């Protein structure tokens, strides 16, 4: 089986990750003790992708829970799934990273990293045929961003040919926890550009908007936001976990989605989003589902795809849907909005269909877009970064951990390069010889 090793780092990563395990345990019929109570063989057919089978038919998530302080771990342990995870896979420090990227990446995190890598090796050795790794973390804090990127870099060295995916929560301007978020996020993106194959960008602001506007929740809390994230994560990983007519694994997704190795930051979306009360009153046709999937209001990151163009898109449908109708609707969407798709990548929309819908849905769709509009998200962080870095504000927190200002400048220019690469591919037409004229002067 193509196994995945799941890692979650920091407070945000552990909360989102735990919610994800709740969601997929429900889908696979695994209760909180790890016993199977499902009603369909399909639930067990590819269960090895995420679970190890322990003694007495108990299923144990192949998950590592990592944090630099014990608090979040304790709440996961006492939560609904506390007994499900393997006790040895809780790896935590005592000091905390204090929202400081340098502590997570260079000092505190570096002390814990060997312990984490030992558990990673143990999990990988038990695999039949390891497909890759996925990491849940946020980019605004200290542990998820600093230690998370350190972990990715280390695993990349040791398993260079395995796919590396991250679900990264990008800090948003309206929902901010700490002043140094722009620093932490920029330093993290600097690492992610080089070290991951696919990064799904999730944004608290977009999640709040969905809760307010679409789900009509008067005061959404973090568990509502995490529920949305877990729906999306479950959708993205559907085709790995269930047999369907079109199965794609993470590597196929990467091949279809990443036209240039640096541009691997995706905007995920989910449909149908309806408030819990009105859900049962709506029947969702494929037409409606497709329309919703491409709607900016359903995107989990705060950028508007209509401000840019899609390089590639993957659409995953779940439920009893007709393949032909799915293909027709997607084609229709593409022809009607052809200006929003770059014309130099023909058939750049990939569809996958899985027969098993998520819990509580008849049909559902997950959307993954590689759009040039995501530069809005990076530009926002970059502007905040520059404003603070120009004044060298808060820099002593980082330099006292042994970081150099040089590293900040590098991260800043790498982020700006990324933004201009997206911009460049947004503007290029089918007949522009972009590569040739740039390559000429080097001779």
UniProtKB/Swiss-Prot annotation:
Q: Which GO terms describe its molecular function?
A: GTP binding; GTPase activity; metal ion binding; structural constituent of cytoskeleton
Question: What does the UniProt keyword field contain?
Answer: Cytoplasm, Cytoskeleton, GTP-binding, Magnesium, Metal-binding, Microtubule, Nucleotide-binding
Gene Ontology, cellular component aspect:
cytoplasm; microtubule
Q: Which InterPro entries match?
A: Beta-tubulin_BS, Beta_tubulin, Tub_FtsZ_C, Tubulin, Tubulin/FtsZ-like_C, Tubulin/FtsZ_2-layer-sand-dom, Tubulin/FtsZ_GTPase_sf, Tubulin_C
Q: Which GO terms are recorded in the biological process aspect for this UniProt protein?
A: microtubule-based process
Residues bound to Mg(2+) are 69
SUPFAM superfamilies the record matches? Tubulin C-terminal domain-like, Tubulin nucleotide-binding domain-like
Q: What does this protein do?
A: Tubulin is the major constituent of microtubules, a cylinder consisting of laterally associated linear protofilaments composed of alpha- and beta-tubulin heterodimers. Microtubules grow by the addition of GTP-tubulin dimers to the microtubule end, where a stabilizing cap forms. Below the cap, tubulin dimers are in GDP-bound state, owing to GTPase activity of alpha-tubulin.
Q: How does it assemble?
A: Dimer of alpha and beta chains. A typical microtubule is a hollow water-filled tube with an outer diameter of 25 nm and an inner diameter of 15 nM. Alpha-beta heterodimers associate head-to-tail to form protofilaments running lengthwise along the microtubule wall with the beta-tubulin subunit facing the microtubule plus end conferring a structural polarity. Microtubules usually have 13 protofilaments but different protofilament numbers can be found in some organisms and specialized cells.
Q: Which family does it belong to?
A: Belongs to the tubulin family.
According to UniProt, the name of this protein is Tubulin beta-3 chain
State the organism named in the record: Echinococcus multilocularis (Fox tapeworm)
- Gene name linked to the record: TUB-3
